[in-house]
Regions:
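Metal-cofactor-binding active-site regions of metalloenzymes
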Residues: 1-288, 340-342, 346-351, 358, ...
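Catalytic core of soluble alpha/beta enzymes
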Residues: 243-258, 276, 294-356
């Protein structure tokens, strides 16, 4: 029997251990998609309590606390930080089998040197020690990033954001690149009641009067170029439902005018507007050699009562099951026909889409850029041991696992970087298993190079930050 969360955690063979220790463990991190705050990084934010560092904004934890019968007052409500932490400690023993159980203990070990199992009995001592350390030196946001050996962070930013803190960080002595990620979702959601207000914010940020569809595209382009000048090389699109509908520029202009004036926009018109705008952005991204990310098939805000009282991103989303193959292929093909398909990373929240994406990406590789079209790492509800292995196996079965750009945190917490360790251990177990079973040669130079690529070097070459 192995020790709980011991040195060989998730490593199931001698080859896996060797690959991890000699090739994966000490590789730097490129966190090319996350939700960290550039302001908090610039200010080297510190945390008064482990609750603030660990539980604020973490809807992963909130979901299972609710499932454990914890009242909302101790989750997002007005309970004290101590009460909220003890409520989490009460929940943790019930979470065996959930990745949060592993992540919780991995983070306690790596950041705080705590190897006890977290439960109601150990909660008081854990509360005391973590808070003492957090209130001392070396636990600010920048410190945590540096301790994690992070080289690049890409945040998630609205096109209308000023990027003030990215510029301040660029001018500072902080050695980690903190770069903006272009997330124009509000600009594509033309049926949203807030669309017109968002266009006004885009107008203000760009200095371009937005009165027509063309001026809207001009304003978007001006912000893309501003992000580019700030070091940005990635965009991200939440395409909860993958759509594709051809339209003309004239029809897109009509639909835009309707949305801007607050008129009802039909679903068919929304599809046309999104398609035309994404096609335009594809060309712009390709020109600037950006990587475009699509996050597909999330079903958001499913509990309308809770959405009304708590708002979005509070733990009430789930997996969607919309069909993606035809609209995704048509969108990629429409860009490729014009030689305007940028580097692209595709994620789906529905694991049933794994082989659809893994097979599709090789229809659009260009024979020049290794892994130009990527099957992105297991995302959100799939960010588990099984989910990661399923994604990696689908990719290896359909294409080149060796060209995979690997892990990202997609996190709002500065304590979440041990998730890269979790991922890297699984990579080594998968590749080590192939060698142990005679499916790959026991060539440590070859296997080690692949491991280093997936952990860091492939992303370094792919993004060229």
């Amino acid at each position: 029997m192995k020790a709980f969360m011991g040195d060989d955690f998730l490593l199931d063979s001698k080859t896996a251990v060797k690959l991890y220790r000699e090739y994966a463990e000490n590789m730097p991190i490129i966190d090319y998609h996350c939700h960290l705050s550039p302001k908090e990084i610039y200010e080297n934010k510190t945390f008064a309590t482990i609750t603030e560092a660990w539980l604020y904004g973490d809807h992963y934890k909130w979901r299972i606390m609710r499932a454990n019968g914890i009242e909302e007052r101790c989750i997002t409500g007005n309970a004290s930080d101590e009460e909220k932490f003890f409520a989490w400690a009460k929940t943790v023993p019930m979470a065996i089998g959930n990745p949060l159980y592993s992540w919780t203990h991995l983070e306690l070990q790596r950041w705080f040197g705590i190897y006890d199992v977290l439960n109601e009995k150990t909660a008081a001592a854990t509360w005391k020690k973590t808070n003492e350390l957090l209130q001392g030196d070396g636990f600010g946001a920048r410190d945590l990033i540096l301790k994690s050996n992070v080289k690049v962070i890409c945040t998630t930013d609205d096109p209308a954001d000023a990027l003030t803190y990215h510029e301040l960080l660029k001018e500072s002595d902080f050695p980690v690149q903190v770069l903006p990620g272009f997330r124009p979702d509000k600009g594509l959601d033309i049926s949203s009641p807030g669309f017109a207000d968002w266009v006004r914010s885009l107008e203000s940020a760009s200095g371009i009067a937005v009165t027509t569809y063309q001026s809207y595209l001009d304003a978007l382009e001006s912000r893309v170029r501003l992000f580019h000048n700030a070091g940005g090389r990635v965009s991200d699109h939440a395409l909860d439902q993958m759509v594709y509908a051809e339209t003309t520029e004239e029809e897109a202009a009509r639909i835009f005018a309707a949305g801007l004036s607050g008129e009802h926009v039909s679903f068919e018109d929304e599809k046309k507007f999104k398609t035309r705008t994404l096609q335009y952005l594809c060309g712009l991204y390709a020109e600037l050699d950006w990587a475009m990310q699509f996050h597909i098939n999330a079903l958001r805000n499913t509990n309308t009562n809770k959405f009304s009282s708590l708002g979005p991103d509070t733990g009430y989303d789930s997996i969607n099951d919309e069909r993606i193959a035809k609209p995704l292929a048509r969108l990629l093909n429409s860009a490729e026909k014009k030689r305007q398909l940028p580097k692209t990373i595709l994620y789906s929240l529905n694991p049933n889409d794994n082989y659809i994406i893994a097979s599709m990406i090789n229809s659009f590789q260009d024979g020049k850029t290794p892994g130009k079209i990527q099957f992105g790492t297991a995302w959100w509800f799939n960010d588990t041991k099984d989910g990661m292995l399923q994604q990696m196996k689908a990719l290896s079965n359909m294409g080149l696992f060796s060209r995979f750009i690997g892990m990202l945190t997609d996190s709002r917490s500065f304590l979440s970087y041990p998730r890269h360790e979790y991922f890297r251990r699984l990579v080594c177990t998968l590749i080590g298993g192939w060698a142990e079973q005679g499916e790959a040669p026991y060539d440590m130079e070859l296997l080690g190079k692949i491991v280093e690529g997936i952990c860091y070097r492939n992303a370094e070459e792919y993004f060229r930050f």
